[in-house]
Each structure stands twice: as structure tokens, then as C-alpha cells.
Curated annotation (Swiss-Prot):
InterPro entries: FA_synthesis (IPR003664), Phospholipid_synth_PlsX-like (IPR012281). The lineage of its organism: Bacteria, Pseudomonadati, Pseudomonadota, Alphaproteobacteria, Hyphomicrobiales. It comes from Rhodopseudomonas palustris (strain BisB18). HAMAP family: PlsX. Its main location: cytoplasm. One of its GO terms (molecular function) is phosphate:acyl-[acyl carrier protein] acyltransferase activity. It holds the Pfam family FA_synthesis. Homodimer. Probably interacts with PlsY. It is found in: Cytoplasm. This is Phosphate acyltransferase. Keywords: Cytoplasm, Lipid biosynthesis, Lipid metabolism, Phospholipid biosynthesis, Phospholipid metabolism, Transferase.
Amino acid sequence: MSQKVRIALDAMGGDFGASVVVPGAAISLTRHPDSEFLLFGDSALINKQLDLHPALQKVSRVFHTDIAVSMHDKPSQALRRGRKVSSMWLAIEAVKKGEADVAVSAGNTGALMAMARFCLRTLPGIDRPAIAAIWPTIRGDSVVLDLGATIGGDAEHLKALAVMGSAMASVLFDLERPTVGLLNIGVEEIKGGEEIRAAAELLREMNSPQFEFIGFVEGDGIGKGAADVIVSEGFSGNIALKAAEGTARQISEYLKAAMSRTWRSKIGYLFAREAFRSLRDKMDPNKSNGGVFLGLNGVVVKSHGGTSADGFAYAVDVGYDMVRYDLLNKINQTLNRGGGALGGTPTAREAVS
């Protein structure tokens, strides 16, 4: 495929704005030279960074706005103040207008979700979008969702997540019928609240040809790779994500302290440093950065707000991959196959609450 992938960036999003977004885009460009970028934000700050990255500068267009969404803005505040004028909105709107294939932002998650829903709308049959990400496991990678887009959710919502997540896994992992599990406090059918047990019953009744529902998965099953797709409502999913990232950093610090404690451990490290580097790379949260907003009429990727340039580059990579894999069309095909994979699910809400 020779066509360029057009990536819209909220250059003012996150804790560090253009000082991370632009270098991150430059790193991603080295891996995907068929990318081009639309950068939205303060042109003076953006151009200052672009001057340091001439290769990126050649394939970038800058669109000025001095209005940025704060990391502390409530979604309703962000919509009132930033609709049609903020760097976040303009990046998303570029996707709606067909000027970009994907939007990437490290900004406020709630504001980004609200703006994306308001601007792009949801797919038919999808009531609320979800944040999905690739989760490294001991048996490969899994798709995990929802990682914080929506707090709570009824059985129909969890069913929709399973359908979208399975479509994503099918595309990314080349699986004909990925396995799907519901995150729960136990694997027994009697465990969990009413909604999750009702969702399990719906998924069993579906007997979908597009995925295999394997039942409940406990928290430790995520890292074990118990299923190709792990489904959770956003509150529990976000806690699981942050706990895993914190644990990875904790183990890294423990290893660093242990390897520098005595001269013997330092010598041992010299012999085993390649193995430790491999472990560090595998556990680096930056390499799992980039959550995809599933269920929208467009592709939007959320980066961690406090990430580094390397971390933001991985989020841009995710956006690039979603376009190259034609994820949006594949999800649409899955939802529409056989008269609608979500048969009976109400159509999307037209407004953001």
C-alpha cells in the first residue's frame, strides 16, 4: 500500500505538549516513513521543535491554535470551551473531514472521549465507546478493553465490548475465532455481580462464529494470556492497567537495586545484562502505550499524559497500525455480519451526556 498514512496530532495534549509530541512523532516517522502529520497547537512551540527534526518538518503541516484542553478540565467544560477551537478538537475534526486517517492525543482522557463522541459519533449498535489496548502476556499479546472510557456498564454494553474486541484481535493477530473472557473476581459461574453474570449468559447464547467465549477470567489471567480478548467495564479495567504498569516499574526498581547492591551482584549483572535488558524492554510500559477508542466513526488513539517522547512514539505507531490494518472497516464488517453481531442492541446515542 503506497498511500500515505495521515496522522493528526494534538500537539498541546499531555503533561509536556509539543516538547514530547513532536520528538515522539519524529521517532515514529523513522519506523514508518510513509507517514505524514498534521500538528494542531501553538505554532511557535511546534515550529521550535520541528526545527530540531528536519525529516519530520518536511512531512508536517502546522495548524495554529492557542487553545488547549487542560488535564484538569471536566469533559463538559472541555466541550464548552474547546469545541471547534482547541488543539484536541481540531485533531479529531481532521479525521471527521477526511483530512487525516487517525488522531492521536496525550490529553485529558475524559475530554478526549467526549469530544470524539460528539465530533465523530458512534457506530450503529454501539452505545458507548471503549478504550482498547494491546497487553503483553506470557503467551503473546491480548486485547484488553475497556481501560477507562466508561465507568460501569450493563450486560449489553459488555456484549458490545466483546464483539468489538474480538474484531480487533482478529485483525491484529490474524485469528479466525479469537477467545474472549470476562474479567471477574473468580472463574465460577456464580461469581461476580448481576450485570457481569448476565453478560456471560448473553455471550453464551450468542454462540458467535466470530469469537469463542470461554467464561470468566481472574485478574492474574490477563498476564497469563488466558484469552485473546479480556473484557471489563472501564473502572475495573483502568485499575488493572495502572496496577500492571506500577508493578512493572516496581519490579524494575527491585532488579536495579539488587544488581547494584554488592560487587558480586554487579559482576553477575555484567554476565546477565542482555537478559536483563530484554526483560526491561518487555516490561517497559512505554511499549504498551496507546489505547484505541473503539466504537467511533473514526480512529482515535489515546497516549498516556505523562509519557516520554519514546512512549508517545509508540502511541503514534498504534495509530499507524490501526489505519494500515483497516481496523474501522473490519469492525464495521463484524458488526454488520449476519444481520448485525449485536442484534437487538439499541443504536448509538446522538449526544454526549
